[in-house]
Amino acid sequence: MDKLKIIMEKGTERLKRGFAKMVKGGVIMDVTNAEQARIAEEAGAVAVMALHKVPADIRKAGGVARMAPVEKIQEIMDAVTIPVMAKCRIGHEAEARILEALGVDMIDESEVLTPADPFFHIYKKKFTAPFVCGARNLGEAVRRIWEGAAMIRTKGEAGTGNIIEAVRHVRLVNENIRLIQRMTDEEIYGVAEKFAEPYLRLAFSVKEISGLPKRVLENEPIYEGFTYREIVEDIYKILLEIKKLGRLPVVNFAAGGVATPADAALMMAMGMDGVFVGSGIFKSSNPPKMARAIVEAVNHWDEPDVLAEISREIGEPMRGQAIEELQVRMEERGI
C-alpha cells in the first residue's frame, strides 16, 4: 500500500475515534421527531439517534425495518445543536452512503433494523463518517473494529426495557479481555484465527454449492479484497492492543434494555464509557424527567445517595418484556 495512503487512512481513523471520544461519559437518546430531539438536548444528551420508530415500536410493527426517511433525519438535524446519529441496516452500503451525504455525525450499522446482507457487515474504512456497531462478545467487537468502527456498543435486546442481555454482553467482553491478558502471543494468534472465521461463510457456501471442499487458497480474497490470512494478521494486532490496554481500543457504550436511572448506573459501574437509551425515554410515562434522570445517573453512577434522589418522582418506566417471550432476537443479527 502507498505510504501516503496509509498515513491518510490512519489520520482518518484517528478523527473518527476522536469524535467518539467527544461523547464519552454521556447519554445518547433515540428520537423520532424534532420535539423529542429538543427534549433530549434539554435533558443533557450528548447526541441523539434519529429513527422512524423507537425499537419497541419497530419490534411491535414487524415487517422490514429500514433507514429512517431522509426528511425525518433532516428535521431532527435542524432541531438541535448536539450531534445527530442515524441507523442503517447491517451490510446496506447504499443507506450508509445516503446518511453520510446527509451529514449525520455518526452512522449506526444496527441490528435493530432488518439486516440487508446475510454474509457481511459494511467495510467502514471506505467511509469518512464514523460508525458505531453493536457486539455481543469480543469476537464481534474485534471484527467491527477491524472493519473500521470508531465506537462499539453492547447489542443488549433493544425495545424490551430488559437489561439482562446488555449485562451478558458486557460480562462476555470483559471476561474475554481478561483471558486475552493471560495468554501468550502465540495463543492470541489462535484466537485471531477463530475470530476471523465468520468472514469465510460466503466462500465456503459457494464452494459447497459447487461441490468443492470447504477451504480457501492462501491468496484467495474473501472480503473486500482481503485474504483470510490478512484478516487474521490485522485482528491479531487488535488483540495485542487489547491485551496491552486491558480494554477495547475504541469507546464502548452500553445499549439495549436501559430503561431506568439504575440501569444506566449499573452499566457505568460495569466499566462502560456511556449509555444509549432507545425506547426507555419516550416509552416512559414522563419522558423529560426520565431523560434528565438517566443523564444524571450516568454522571453520578458511583454515588448511591445521589442516585436515590435522582430516582424520585420520575414517573413509570417503560413496560418491560421478558427475553424468553420474544419471537425475534435482534441481538442475534450480524456476524
Swiss-Prot record:
Active-site residues, record numbering mapped to chain: K87
Membrane-spanning intervals of the chain: none
InterPro entries hit by this protein: Aldolase_TIM (IPR013785), PdxS/SNZ (IPR001852), PdxS/SNZ_N (IPR033755), RibuloseP-bd_barrel (IPR011060), Thiazole_synthase_ThiG (IPR033983)
Functional pathway: Cofactor biosynthesis; pyridoxal 5'-phosphate biosynthesis
Any Pfam family matching the protein: SOR_SNZ
GO molecular function: pyridoxal 5'-phosphate synthase (glutamine hydrolysing) activity
Binding-site list for D-ribose 5-phosphate: D30, G159, G257, G278, S279
GO biological process: amino acid metabolic process; pyridoxal phosphate biosynthetic process; pyridoxine biosynthetic process
Binding positions for D-glyceraldehyde 3-phosphate per the UniProt entry: R171
The entry's keywords: Lyase, Pyridoxal phosphate, Schiff base
Catalytic reaction(s) noted: aldehydo-D-ribose 5-phosphate + D-glyceraldehyde 3-phosphate + L-glutamine = pyridoxal 5'-phosphate + L-glutamate + phosphate + 3 H2O + H(+)
Organism domain of life: Archaea
Entry EC number(s): 4.3.3.6
Entry-linked SUPFAM superfamilies: Ribulose-phoshate binding barrel
Function: Catalyzes the formation of pyridoxal 5'-phosphate from ribose 5-phosphate (RBP), glyceraldehyde 3-phosphate (G3P) and ammonia. The ammonia is provided by the PdxT subunit. Can also use ribulose 5-phosphate and dihydroxyacetone phosphate as substrates, resulting from enzyme-catalyzed isomerization of RBP and G3P, respectively.
Subunit structure: Homohexamer. In the presence of PdxT, forms a dodecamer of heterodimers.
PANTHER family associated with the record: PYRIDOXAL 5'-PHOSPHATE SYNTHASE SUBUNIT SNZ1-RELATED
Family note: Belongs to the PdxS/SNZ family.
Protein's name according to its UniProt entry: Pyridoxal 5'-phosphate synthase subunit PdxS
Organism: Pyrococcus horikoshii (strain ATCC 700860 / DSM 12428 / JCM 9974 / NBRC 100139 / OT-3)
Gene this chain is encoded by: pdxS
